[in-house]
């Protein structure tokens, strides 16, 4: 659930972990799925699970930002109306339209194989193939979708992170005084394991299912998010390789393409806070910033070229390329989301 997701993010970014052999099994090791009869591990960490849960609770009350017409200019309603029809044909099968004001909404997100959508595969490949030393976690079991795997001397990083996240959530905060520590822990455990309104469900879309031979195969796919507030989230694609929404509607220049065509930039500047309301994104040239080079591994700006007639829809159909005017119509509609 949300608590596990946020805990995993903190561990992956800047959390400090102090894993030590525990003297004996306890309630935390039991909840964390640690096997009896082997070395028990204490998962003390700098992760404040209680605060993460409170932050998540506050985030549930937020709504996506609305295009500020008094600052960035009025939306052309006629263009936006035409763009809505294009969105319905080209986009909505993956990117569900939602009501930003409805806190009880449920979103069915569709998965797309990296090979199908054509975007840079490095992140998904790393999530599946990255290995790390298990240390004192060796010989622990980790429960995955298709069953338990036994951690060897080297094990998939995704499995190690899963084990660490579950046990960090299950461990009381050692920095708090006794009463506060256990009060917060009981509340957090109850909320994390029993009050999660979003239940686990089968993934939807096109992806390779996990199997006993490849227990992390489904990670080789990206999830299509709803596009509410998309105008405010530049740069685009999962690796930030496309600076503006307008550029996202263009194809990547490939060998043999005409030189006078309009393509996604292979290099652009990042670091500006100046917004470009015409292309919908942050200013990406004309200043001294850091250069984003799409030729580097992990930085490719290819793929997701539906508007250019190069990427197939979920049903396998490739739609015709949009004209310049149709792209501007779609861009105008995206401002309204």
Question: Model-found features: residue ranges?
Answer:
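Periplasmic c-type cytochrome electron-transfer domains
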Residues: 1-337
């Amino acid at each position: 659930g949300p608590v596990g997701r946020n805990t995993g993010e903190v561990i992956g970014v800047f959390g400090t972990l102090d894993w030590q052999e525990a003297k004996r099994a306890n309630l935390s090791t039991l909840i964390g799925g640690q096997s009896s009869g082997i070395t028990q591990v204490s998962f003390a960490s700098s992760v404040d699970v209680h605060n993460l849960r409170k932050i998540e609770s506050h985030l549930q009350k937020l709504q996506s930002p609305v295009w500020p017409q008094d600052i960035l200019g009025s939306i052309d309603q006629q263009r936006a109306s035409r763009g809505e029809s294009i969105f319905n044909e080209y986009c909505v099968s993956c990117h569900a339209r939602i009501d930003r004001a409805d806190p009880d909404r449920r979103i069915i997100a569709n998965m797309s194989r990296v090979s199908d959508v054509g975007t840079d595969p490095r992140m998904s490949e790393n999530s599946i193939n990255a290995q790390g030393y298990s240390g004192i976690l060796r010989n622990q079991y980790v429960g995955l979708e298709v069953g338990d795997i036994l951690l060897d001397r080297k094990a998939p990083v995704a499995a190690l992170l899963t084990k660490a996240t579950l046990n960090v959530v299950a461990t009381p905060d050692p920095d708090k005084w006794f009463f506060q520590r256990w009060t917060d822990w009981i509340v957090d455990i109850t909320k994390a394991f029993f009050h999660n309104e979003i239940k686990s469900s089968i993934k939807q879309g096109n992806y390779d299912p996990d199997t006993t031979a490849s227990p992390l195969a489904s990670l080789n796919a990206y999830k299509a998010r709803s596009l509410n507030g998309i105008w405010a989230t530049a740069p685009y694609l999962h690796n930030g390789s496309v600076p503006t929404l307008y550029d996202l509607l263009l194809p990547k220049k490939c060998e043999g393409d005409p030189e006078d065509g309009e393509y996604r930039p292979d290099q652009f500047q990042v670091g500006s806070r100046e917004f470009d309301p015409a292309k919908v994104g942050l200013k990406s040239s004309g200043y001294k910033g850091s250069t984003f080079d799409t030729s580097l591994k992990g930085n490719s700006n290819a793929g997701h070229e539906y508007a250019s007639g190069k990427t197939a829809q979920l049903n396998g159909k490739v739609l015709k390329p949009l004209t310049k005017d149709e792209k501007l119509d779609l861009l105008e509609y995206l401002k309204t989301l």
